[in-house]
From Swiss-Prot:
GO MF annotation list: N-acetyl-gamma-glutamyl-phosphate reductase activity; NAD binding; NADP+ binding
Name the UniProt record assigns to this protein: N-acetyl-gamma-glutamyl-phosphate reductase
PROSITE patterns: ARGC
Organism: Xanthomonas axonopodis pv. citri (strain 306)
Function: Catalyzes the NADPH-dependent reduction of N-acetyl-5-glutamyl phosphate to yield N-acetyl-L-glutamate 5-semialdehyde.
InterPro entries: AGPR_AS, AGPR_type-1, NAD(P)-bd_dom_sf, NAGSA_dehydrogenase, Semialdehyde_DH_NAD-bd
The enzyme's E.C. designation: 1.2.1.38
């Protein structure tokens, strides 16, 4: 019996994440790319901009109602923050059964939406057709903090450094290679959206200081954790190993991971466990590709989970 592929549309397909999504959809045996929406690229062939896609589809400039009329089985919204609501409203009205995955921060605090960080929230998925994809920094922070959450004596301090692709394609200081050359650019040093996101998800205050670096892709997250009681390095390492033993996308490593080794890869590396004298303060480092596990790969995990497929279909 032949399984009919599910149709999928991507809104905001010009961006870096949109490009990665197209690659993953092209590799997926059960998905058919039915539309891609981009105002800037409207009329141009997708294959001219993305080597992974070999079909005849062209970019379209679709408003919210036009997207809803397409009646795709799945719609992924890869739009800047604050832009998703009209599309969600139109789909809610026309085809509420459509699976919507939103990559912006717009619905991460909405309890009606499933918050899709599979390694931590998979067990709470209950068939929701509205899924909010976590932030890139927020993914790295939560995966690093979670194994020690019950041992925390105070707010984790998280020093994050991202490649400039995290600043999107709209020109700004934070994605200007000339300004970033030989530079590190701190920004939003308190109350960053991802700081609030992680605090809400984990139920503890978190302190986060983000920076943009000259490399294109990949995040390094260095997390300082104060512990209620002394733990040995072996005990801490065991917590991470046991917590993620069945998670193919999470690799626990001995040395502190390098961002250059994770760029272009779907997973997360966590390691470099270093204790301060007294064993009540530990520093742990995580790396991930902000465009993949921080965005497109995670969206594909959530899509597969929601449709009852192997979570890593098209990913490995």
């Amino acid at each position: 019996m032949t399984v009919q592929p599910k149709t999928i549309g991507i809104v905001g397909a010009r961006g870096h994440t949109g490009s990665e999504l197209i690659k993953l959809v092209a590799a997926h045996p059960q998905l058919h790319l039915s539309f891609v929406s981009s105002r800037e690229l409207a009329g141009q062939r997708v294959a001219e901009h993305n080597d992974a896609y070999q079909g005849q589809l062209r970019y379209e400039n679709l408003d919210a109602d036009a997207v809803a009329v397409k009646a795709a089985d799945v719609v992924i919204l890869a739009l800047p923050n604050g832009k998703a609501a009209p599309f969600v409203a139109a789909i809610d009205a026309a085809t509420p059964q459509t699976l919507v995955i939103d990559l912006s921060a717009d619905y991460r605090f909405d309890p009606a939406w499933y918050y899709g960080l599979p390694e931590l929230t998979r067990g709470s998925y209950a068939g929701q057709r509205r899924i909010s994809n976590p932030g890139c920094y927020a993914t790295a922070m939560q995966l690093t903090i979670a194994p020690l959450l019950d041992q925390l004596a105070g707010p984790p301090q998280c020093f994050g450094v991202s490649g400039y692709s995290g600043a999107g394609t709209t020109p700004s200081d934070k994605n200007n290679p000339e300004l970033l050359s030989n530079n590190l650019m701190p920004y939003a040093l308190t109350n960053h959206m991802h700081e609030r996101e992680v605090s809400a998800q984990l139920g503890v205050p978190v302190e986060f200081m983000p920076h943009v670096a000259p490399h294109f892709r990949g995040i390094t997250m260095t997390v300082n954790l104060w512990l209620q009681q002394p733990l040995t390095r072996e005990q801490i390492q065991a917590r991470y190993t046991q917590r993620y033993a069945d998670e193919p996308l999470i690799e626990i490593v001995d040395e502190a991971p390098w961002v250059s080794r994770i760029a272009g890869k779907h997973g997360v590396q966590i390691g470099g466990v270093t204790l301060a004298p007294g064993n009540k303060r530990v520093v742990v480092v995580a790396t991930l590709d902000n465009l993949l596990k921080g965005a497109a790969t995670q969206a594909m995990q959530n899509l597969n989970l929601a449709l009852g497929w192997d979570e890593l279909m098209a990913i490995r």
